[in-house]
């Protein structure tokens, strides 16, 4: 806990004579200044819409050049024109009288470049310059400890650049408490009231026994460098935004590893990541954006856990839209691995997820356009009011539903660990599967829609529930299959076939329970095997649909010793128990412990002896709305 003392020592009172954080106005300076920098602008919304409403600011097109200026990425400096500060124990010397020194506190008031070297046992570097000043601090093998405040405090400036000199190793730390020195609530090792950029080819270690690692009350930009941060609270915190172009990060925190939040402006408080390598271990969220969260690329290893049941422990979290365009993610969380309180779009990326709650969850619309998603253990795999899969390879092992479309939200989290999500039957809830390869191993419903279920392409394989209280397929409204491959095996008590609006043949049969590992096969009347697949679980019913099933033809289904022949008088054979049975997406209530999944991925990929023409996933348009099932003519061979 941060201990902010109100009693000032005589030393600090003296320092305040030089470091009072005034609202400085523009004035001419004599020191060498930085290059002219263009103004950074926030991203704007393109106005694209999706089913479901949200008041959150949700930009859909972002230009990376709007996120970073040329100066943000510039790591060079002219040493001959720079002011040199030498730190030594409890004293500081400067090559210029433009720096005010009081004991172990140096105050910089003039625009320019300052090179710091050496070590301070207990001191501060303060920037208190004009509100137009751009100041560069070069850390060249610097160690600064501040027992009662920030090691670096930006009180006033237009923008400050902290550059890690090439090959340098730098350490900044706080001693475990913060003493108030002005009206600002300083609570981090690096604390900035102004825009702050970090870059360079060196290393920065930050140890915050209390408070946060790095805080900017405006924009926090990191363009390059290596950062090892251990903080009692947040690791990186930006009020207006966190923007990361590149870098290597190892962050261990008592709260969120990355945290951005601006309660006064819904267009701010966002996190944008263009790339980098991230190893995040948090007792809160891995990343928490009060606005939107957009990841272009990068490598992410995220672990969250805590004994505090009231704390959110998600991997990636956004109050606004969450978009992933690429990257490699290994996420192990107690709460949702990837979560948006609004809409979410996954355009690409490789995900390996273990979670005690949902794998990928959106309170509104979830769209998967591509990527490789493996959810080894979860409560529910994919969840949103509307779930749309246009392409990709998805493997889900769930203790409840594999894919769930339902109204409501779970902003408080912990559907699996602490009880069901706050969902109810919703006519707006829909699942659209238009392409890709989906393997589901679910203890609850394999695919569960509180509204409608539409399959237009792709391949879907479900090792469904062994309990008769759930079904491999469950929907409350209507369903249809117009393309693709579907094999869904599970218990027979709640078994459902696809609906009468289907334009391709679909068969539901029930039989005596077959052992796990028993192969299901479909053959035509000439004995040609059309498709075969092996379930990882016991089952007593199966739904099979492929483009090869046509009206008027006869087919043989085998499952272990069971064999039956069916004649397709219509495109739908066997309706099951009716329209949905128990309401789909009923909030689960499985409520059990964190799942101990076996990593099973919903059976083995089927062995097909024909070319399955008509099975290539559709070439979807790029507007990412994903909300209306297309009129499919193409083939659907998967990814």
Task: Map each language-model feature to its residues.
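A composition-driven surface/loop motif
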Residues: 2-639
């Amino acid at each position: 806990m941060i201990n902010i003392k109100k009693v000032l020592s005589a030393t600090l009172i003296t320092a305040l004579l030089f470091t009072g954080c005034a609202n400085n106005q523009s004035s001419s300076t004599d020191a060498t200044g930085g290059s002219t920098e263009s103004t950074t602008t926030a991203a704007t919304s393109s106005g694209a819409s999706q089913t479901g409403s949200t008041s959150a600011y949700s930009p859909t097109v972002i230009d990376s050049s709007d996120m970073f200026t040329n100066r943000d990425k510039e790591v060079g400096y002219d040493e001959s024109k720079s002011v040199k500060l030498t730190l030594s124990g409890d004293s500081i010397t400067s090559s210029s009288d433009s720096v005010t020194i009081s004991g172990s506190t140096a105050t910089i008031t003039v625009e320019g470049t300052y090179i710091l070297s050496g070590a301070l046992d207990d001191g501060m570097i303060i920037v208190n310059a004009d509100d137009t000043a751009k100041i560069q601090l070069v850390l060249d093998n610097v160690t600064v400890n501040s027992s009662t405040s920030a090691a670096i405090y930006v009180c006033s400036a237009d923008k400050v650049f902290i550059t890690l000199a090439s090959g340098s190793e730098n350490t900044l730390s706080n001693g475990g408490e913060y003493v108030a020195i002005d009206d600002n609530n300083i609570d981090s090792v690096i604390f900035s009231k102004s825009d702050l950029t970090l870059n360079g080819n060196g290393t920065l270690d930050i140890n915050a026994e209390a408070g946060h690692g790095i805080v900017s009350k405006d924009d926090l930009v990191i363009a390059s460098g290596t950062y090892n941060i251990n903080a009692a609270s947040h690791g990186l915190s930006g009020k207006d935004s966190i923007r990361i172009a590149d870098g290597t990060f190892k962050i261990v925190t008592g709260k969120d590893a990355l945290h951005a939040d601006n309660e006064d402006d819904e267009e701010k408080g966002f996190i944008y990541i263009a790339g980098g390598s991230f190893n995040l271990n948090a007792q809160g969220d891995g990343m928490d954006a009060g606005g939107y969260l957009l990841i272009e690329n990068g490598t992410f290893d995220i672990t969250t856990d805590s004994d505090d049941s009231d704390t959110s422990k998600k991997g990636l979290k956004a109050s606004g839209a969450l978009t992933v365009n690429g990257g490699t993610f290994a996420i192990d969380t107690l709460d949702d691995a990837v979560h948006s309180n609004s809409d979410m779009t996954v355009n690409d990326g490789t995900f390996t997820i273990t979670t005690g709650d949902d794998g990928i969850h959106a309170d509104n619309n979830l769209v998967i356009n591509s990527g490789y998603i493996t959810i080894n253990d979860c409560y529910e795999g994919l969840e949103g009011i509307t779930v749309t899969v246009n392409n990709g390879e998805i493997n889900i092992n769930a203790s409840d539903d594999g894919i769930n479309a339902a109204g409501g939200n779970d902003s408080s989290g912990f559907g699996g660990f602490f009880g069901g999500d706050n969902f109810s039957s919703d006519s707006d809830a829909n699942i659209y599967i238009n392409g890709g390869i989906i393997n589901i191993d679910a203890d609850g419903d394999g695919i569960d829609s509180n509204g409608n279920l539409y399959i237009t392409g792709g391949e879907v394989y479900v090792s469904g529930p062994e309990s008769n209280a759930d079904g491999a397929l469950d929907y409350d409204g209507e369903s249809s299959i117009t393309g693709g491959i579907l094999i869904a095996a599970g218990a027979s008590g709640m078994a459902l076939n696809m609906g009468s609006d289907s334009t391709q043949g679909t068969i539901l049969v029930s039989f005596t329970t077959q052992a796990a590992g028993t192969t299901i096969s479909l053959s035509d009347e000439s004995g040609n095997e059309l498709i075969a697949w092996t379930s990882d679980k016991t089952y007593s019913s199966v739904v099979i649909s492929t483009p090869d099933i046509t009206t008027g033809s006869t087919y043989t289904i085998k499952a272990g010793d069971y064999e039956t022949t069916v004649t397709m008088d219509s495109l739908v054979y066997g309706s099951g128990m009716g329209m949905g049975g128990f309401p789909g997406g009923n909030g689960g209530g499985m409520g059990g412990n964190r799942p101990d999944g076996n990593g099973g991925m919903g059976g083995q990929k089927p062995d097909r002896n024909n070319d399955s023409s008509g099975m290539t996933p559709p070439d979807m348009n790029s507007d990412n709305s994903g909300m209306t099932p297309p009129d499919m003519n193409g083939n659907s061979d998967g990814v």
